């Protein structure tokens, strides 16, 4: 059981890596169960011409991987949460919970995507209309537009950080409805959105750099070294099995850190332990 206490950003990342290493075998088995089919199809796509040659299949497997990723994320959150609270979780428990949370997580993800997508569209329209208008207004006009545009980007990041732990809320808390996770996540992140942003950026780098580098090398070597390119394409297709649980580890610890800071969750757990003993 990890010590229940408020954590700094480095402690959350280090704790996430520690839990990931501790349960690596269980998380990988869950990852294989969740992603073996989309990973296999992705490998086939990569070695037979890629998305341009199989556009319809590419879209289908992308959707399949998304839903399987929801299953994997929910199951991994269960494993990490139980470990953090000093409990043991069997693979069957993680699989059962993961399967039961696919639809709620899809609904929440769709709602979040629509909201953030709408903000992106508004920012794009602002840029498309504002640049021509302000270009004739001199330096003052351009500076004003720059301030407004930066403010819009800040708003997008602020909203995204406010809803950063909706997934953990859906998986770990009893809710009347999945969309209650939006208000709950916003409440937990109140006052800590900069910290959430920093952790999300670092976690995103940890996840995306290996995938991006391996995928880029595979594409770059497609002509000069097809054999090595095929091997790298296989590795790129398998990386989500390894890396998706790592993201779940980091964000789950961040969720508990927010609960400890906002709700004294550590004292709640301690009182329950004292009562049970």
Regions found by a protein language model. Give the residues of each.
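Membrane-interfacial helix-loop-helix connectors in multipass membrane proteins
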Residues: 129-148, 218-235
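Nonpolar helix-loop interface/hinge motif
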Residues: 1-50, 88-91, 153-230, 236, ...
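Membrane-anchoring/interfacial helices and their immediately flanking loops
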Residues: 40-60, 136-147
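Alpha-helical transmembrane segments and their immediate juxtamembrane interface regions
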Residues: 63-65, 143-165, 229-256
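Hydrophobic core of alpha-helical transmembrane segments in multi-pass integral membrane proteins
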Residues: 123-125, 148-153, 216
């Amino acid at each position: 059981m990890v010590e229940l206490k408020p954590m700094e950003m480095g402690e959350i990342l280090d704790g996430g890596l520690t839990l990931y290493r501790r349960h690596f075998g269980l998380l990988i088995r869950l990852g294989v169960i969740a992603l073996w089919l989309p990973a296999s199809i992705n490998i086939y796509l990569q070695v037979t011409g890629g998305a341009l040659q199989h556009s319809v299949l590419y879209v289908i497997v992308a959707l399949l991987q998304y839903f399987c990723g929801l299953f994997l994320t929910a199951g991994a959150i269960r494993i990490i949460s139980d470990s953090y609270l000093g409990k043991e979780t069997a693979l069957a428990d993680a699989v059962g919970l993961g399967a039961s949370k696919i639809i709620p997580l899809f609904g929440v993800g769709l709602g979040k995507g629509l909201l953030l997508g709408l903000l992106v569209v508004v920012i794009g329209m602002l840029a498309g209309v504002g640049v021509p208008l302000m270009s004739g207004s001199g330096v003052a006009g351009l500076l004003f537009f720059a301030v407004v545009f930066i403010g819009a980007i800040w708003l997008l990041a602020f909203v995204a950080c406010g809803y950063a732990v909706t997934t953990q809320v859906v998986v770990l808390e009893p809710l009347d409805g999945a969309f209650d996770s939006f208000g709950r996540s916003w409440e937990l992140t109140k006052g800590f959105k900069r910290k959430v942003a920093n952790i999300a950026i670092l976690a995103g780098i940890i996840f995306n750099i290996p995938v991006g580098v391996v995928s880029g090398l595979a594409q770059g070597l497609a002509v000069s070294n097809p054999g090595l390119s095929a091997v790298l394409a296989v590795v790129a297709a398998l990386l989500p099995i390894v890396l998706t649980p790592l993201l779940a580890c980091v964000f789950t610890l961040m969720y508990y850190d927010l609960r400890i800071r906002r709700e004294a969750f550590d004292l709640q757990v301690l009182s329950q332990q004292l009562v049970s003993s």
